[in-house]
Amino acid sequence: LIHRDWFAWGTHIPKVIEPQFNTLWAITDFTAENGATRIVPGSQNWSWDKEAKPDQIVQAEMSRGSVLLYTGTVLHGGGQNKSKNPRVGLNLTYCLAWLRQQENQYLSCPPHIAKSLDEELQELIGYTQGTYGLGYFSDPEKPAEKFDLMVPELALGRGPRHRAEFNTDQLSKVEST
């Protein structure tokens, strides 16, 4: 199915805003036979209702270790695997900080696992406050007495790396595991 990931957030975002950037890492070779991802170059500039003609669709054939980069407005889709072997890839998608991520990273990578990751990776999967007023949480297991909203980094037992306004008194509200 050829599609745009951009529509995951509905149609209220102006087209001039690119909400997402995708990386598709080839763990195995991506070939025409094993269904390499199909992509429509230039489709990020098309109107939403324009459909790709077969001769506009190309397969992103690449050797393992390669990466395909494209935005959420680019038409793309998986190809049909006609081989007997699986095509294995890793899709990492980045979206604007004020948008809900497509994958709920907090459930996919809970704090007890995220604590073992590098701080930069923790931030990339959402364990960071982002801009003012975005990314706070309340711990349902430990209702706060006087401070209810906390930045996500506190779930990992640390404060934000890049926030001067961080108050270290908030750390006492998070139990280490």
Residue ranges and their predicted role:
Residues 6-7, 73-75:
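Short beta->alpha connector loops
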Residues 34, 78-79:
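Activation segment
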Residues 46, 50-69, 73, 79-177:
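Conserved double-stranded beta-helix
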